Regions:
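Beta-strand->loop->alpha-helix junctions that form or flank phosphate-binding loops
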Residues: 49-56, 86-88, 198-201
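Gly/Ser/Thr-rich phosphate-binding loop
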Residues: 9-80, 93
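Alpha-helix/helix-capping structural signal
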Residues: 3, 30-31, 119
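AMP-binding/adenylate-forming catalytic core of the ANL superfamily
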Residues: 117, 122-123, 149-221
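Conserved ANL (AMP-binding/adenylate-forming) active-site segment centered on the GW(Y/F)…HTG consensus within
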Residues: 45, 78-82, 120-147, 164, ...
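Conserved ATP/PPi-binding loop(s) of AMP-dependent carboxylate-activating enzymes
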Residues: 84-91, 103-135, 173-175
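Active-site glycine-centered loops adjacent to acidic/histidine catalytic or metal-binding residues
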Residues: 29, 53, 86, 148, ...
Length: 221
């Protein structure tokens, strides 16, 4: 994950020789920030490419790859677009839809990301209701609802801009913001208290949770 790449880049205990056998690195699970990519590549001289997927997609769906030069035509085949999570794997499809109606959204516009392909899970074990919420059948084809918001460009590269499902990714772990809010409300036992949890970038863990409250949570009563 980018969190680990950043740790490797700044750690004096991880030498350049430690990763000399690698040809390239693929990062996923959280957003790859440009400063993390640059720090890692500067230290190890290994290119970093961003990919995308979920546990429900076993776990990959797309990836950026090194560009290929055609020596005969002197042209370069574009396979990497920094800032995106690459193109879909062979046999995998992305569909960008309205999150409510599931109607397709035009190229370049943001919407809910659906993933289709042979790697899509059959379902959550003994959880049919949760499975039904995650899997959409459209024209007899199974699609996984990622909960992520993004768009495809004209070349098929996917950009993720936000999450419909309210989670923070801290050190690569998914933390439900709704659960955080509920646990704090239960612990405070204050019927007048209102809390909203959100997340901000964090240089160490990728993201950090920030709480907005109608009262001072640190005060003693």
């Amino acid at each position: 994950t980018p969190t680990f790449l950043r740790m490797y880049a700044i750690s004096k205990k991880v030498s350049v020789e430690s990763l000399q056998s690698l040809r390239l690195v693929v990062a996923g699970a959280e957003k790859l920030r440009s400063e993390v990519r640059e720090a890692f590549e500067s230290k190890f001289n290994k290119p970093v490419y961003e990919g995308y997927g979920t546990t429900e997609t076993s776990p990959g769906a797309s990836v950026n790859l090194p560009d290929i030069k055609d020596n005969d035509s002197e042209t370069v085949k574009l396979r990497n677009r920094p800032g995106t999570v690459g193109r879909a794997f062979s046999g995998t499809e992305f569909r960008i839809v309205d999150p409510d109606s599931l109607d397709p959204i035009p190229t370049g516009e943001d919407g809910l990301i659906l993933i289709g392909g042979p790697q899509i899970m059959k379902g959550y074990l003994k959880m049919p209701e949760k499975t039904a919420e995650a899997i959409e059948i459209i024209d007899d084809y199974r699609w996984y609802r990622t909960g992520d918001k993004g768009h495809l460009d004209e070349d098929g590269f996917l950009t993720i801009v936000d999450r419909y499902s309210r989670f923070a990714k801290i050190g690569g772990e998914m933390i439900s913001l709704t659960t955080v809010e509920e646990e704090i409300l239960d612990a405070c036992n204050d019927k007048d208290l209102e809390i909203a949890a959100t997340c901000l970038p964090d240089q160490v863990k990728g993201e950090k949770i920030v709480l907005l409250a109608t009262t001072d949570l640190n005060k003693d009563e």
